[in-house]
Design a protein with these regions (language model features):
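Short amphipathic alpha-helical segments and helix-helix/interface helices
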Residues: 44-45, 88, 142-143
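A short, well-structured juxtamembrane/interface segment
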Residues: 28-53, 59-62
């Protein structure tokens, strides 16, 4: 247990023991009731079939059902704030590893750790507008990660036929039981190793636009507005 955890009260530690387990069970139940369809699954599979790994990028708004996409070994970037500890534990119960940090807090150390786990043979999953926004604005960290690893960034999203939209900064989406969920993979984006500041910004904006496009495309399946 790290020093920060030692400062938690016994009540907080009890909640940390209970909530992630309960959350993962509820989420698994929800996923079992939902009918899922994946569009363009060949986009990541083309890399996986060649033994290559990818960086999957999805909006914070749409992260809830991402654990139920067909994945191989994947590590998820999760923020270092207090809520992130609960999320990291829940992700572990769902069978995934986590890297702690974000595009702001702990960014450099998280970047180094993501490079390390990628080179050991893992996909990386990130929410490039998380953990605090602005909504649907890509931060530069994911682009820098792609430059340093040579991995393609593949945007991915989902939409649901029936869902609850929360009033949070990201308008977080909770698909309702027995709804339909459509996942959609976007086209890969490569960032040259020698990319300078201007090229990195160009890549950031291109990724942001592709993520916007696939989100709109997924929402059109159920005629929703993101």
């Amino acid at each position: 247990m790290d020093l920060a955890m030692e400062q938690w009260s016994w009540k907080d530690k009890l909640l940390l023991f209970i909530i992630p387990r309960f959350y993962s069970l509820v989420l698994r139940f929800l996923a079992r009731t939902i009918r899922k369809e994946v569009f363009f699954p060949e986009r990541p599979r083309n890399f996986w079939d060649q033994g290559q790994h990818v960086i999957a990028a999805f909006w914070h708004q749409r992260l809830l059902m991402m654990p139920f996409l067909p994945w191989g070994k994947v590590s998820v970037l999760i923020s270092q704030h207090r809520d992130g500890e609960f999320i990291a534990r829940a992700v572990k119960f769902l069978g995934y590893d986590s890297v702690r940090g974000s595009t702001t807090r702990g960014g450099i150390s998280a970047l180094r750790e993501m490079i390390r786990v990628f080179r050991k043979g893992s996909d990386i999953a990130v929410t490039p507008d998380g953990p605090q926004g602005p909504k649907h604005v890509v931060q530069i960290g994911v682009v820098e990660l792609a430059r340093l690893t040579g991995a393609p960034i593949l945007p991915v999203t989902y939409s649901a036929s029936c869902c609850k939209v929360f009033g949070s900064w990201d308008n977080f989406i909770l698909p309702l039981p027995f709804s339909k969920v459509a996942y959609l993979w976007g086209e890969p984006l490569f960032v040259p190793r020698d990319a300078g500041k201007d090229k990195l910004e160009e890549s950031r904006l291109l990724l942001q636009e592709r993520m916007r496009q696939i989100t709109e495309e997924a929402d059109r399946i159920f005629q929703k507005k993101s």
